[in-house]
Amino acid sequence: MLRILCLALCSLLTGTRADPGALLRLGMDIMNQVQSAMDESHILEKMAAEAGKKQPGMKPIKGITNLKVKDVQLPVITLNFVPGVGIFQCVSTGMTVTGKSFMGGNMEIIVALNITATNRLLRDEETGLPVFKSEGCEVILVNVKTNLPSNMLPKMVNKFLDSTLHKVLPGLMCPAIDAVLVYVNRKWTNLSDPMPVGQMGTVKYVLMSAPATTASYIQLDFSPVVQQQKGKTIKLADAGEALTFPEGYAKGSSQLLLPATFLSAELALLQKSFHVNIQDTMIGELPPQTTKTLARFIPEVAVAYPKSKPLTTQIKIKKPPKVTMKTGKSLLHLHSTLEMFAARWRSKAPMSLFLLEVHFNLKVQYSVHENQLQMATSLDRLLSLSRKSSSIGNFNERELTGFITSYLEEAYIPVVNDVLQVGLPLPDFLAMNYNLAELDIVENALMLDLKLG
């Protein structure tokens, strides 16, 4: 019984993927989006407008009536990472509090203050999305000026100001912090939505666990879900080595790391789109695609077809495409069959001449367009060529190496590049503009150095 339990446990462990399929590191450059969120939401001004309205259940402030808040200064936000927690936030701002004082005259208090809070970064259990939650909000008075008469007893003035401000400001400012975080959290909303890869399937960036915070950055580990249109999930291959960020990037900067295994899984969605049936006789710089041209490389073709016939070529990718990466260079490996047919008269089906198995590599260049990862390829080299069947007898397929190489370059690779124009989706978070990113091919991964512009 114990042995059965052990076997069951081992099978569960081996079936669980613990390694992330993509990594996102957010430095302070990106997290300063909190500043823009406060600017965009105009939350302080809105809170100030609400301050003068009677709120249900709120007791009037003793000694002041007709309370209003105006002249709210543009806030300056300072952020610091708190390891294991999230972000410590300090908002420096100023405003003017007006009203009727207990002495009967108009009162004006000019306040400079700091609002501090810890924004804990969590993973929402229901949505699986990152979420900021504020805690420990405090309002610290930096400077206070008032138009109250100078002949009043200082202790009385200070006591009144202290009582008034500590009643008004926390209720005004701390909800502003929460409201800004709600605004920021909305910018995570689309992160785990399925995004299309053409019409062949979708990619979804699923957060594996709560984001990890260090003294320099926040890291998010993703387990991307690559799913075919019919619902079948494509598993990421085992990378063999743990996915880690390379050294040498500026402190406080932000990067996205996409491993070659993940890109391979995405391209597997497009495998059938790489199948082609080419019937054109004239293609680019190639000689006419006829049996006469083919006979220059295989004399047996001239014997079987004394009169020249048009050729049709069918290429099918037999294994899922595989992306590999070494520093500075990325290759796309394609294992295919290439079958050539000769046309026949009277609407008869073309006759198969031969079937080859072809393994070749394409060099890959990466770019970003409209927030999609783009790939453009060119032939690296033809790796192997083997004959599987032939209707024209035995021949030395190596004699076709130059012919097939030119054919791939002129006829097939343009088809591959057309298919790749669908683009590969990138994580949708904080309204990130990937078009500004700098791309680097590192060991086993593609690095996007994110920029705000």
From Swiss-Prot:
Instruction: Give the matching InterPro entries.
Output: Bactericidal_perm-incr_a/b_dom (IPR017943), BPI_fold-BPI/LBP (IPR051660), Lipid-bd_serum_glycop_C (IPR001124), Lipid-bd_serum_glycop_N (IPR017942)
UniProt entry keywords in alphabetical sequence: Disulfide bond, Glycoprotein, Secreted, Signal
The protein depicted here goes by the name BPI fold-containing family B member 6
What CDD domains is this protein classified in? BPI1 (cd00025)
Q: To which species is this protein native?
A: Homo sapiens
* Sample GO molecular function, one term: lipid binding
Stated consequence of mutating residue 296 to H = De novo variant found in a patient with intellectual disability
Q: According to its UniProt record, where is this protein located?
A: Secreted
Q: Which family does it belong to?
A: Belongs to the BPI/LBP/Plunc superfamily. BPI/LBP family.
- Listed GO cellular component terms? extracellular region
Under the heading SUPFAM superfamilies, the entry gives:
Bactericidal permeability-increasing protein, BPI (SSF55394)
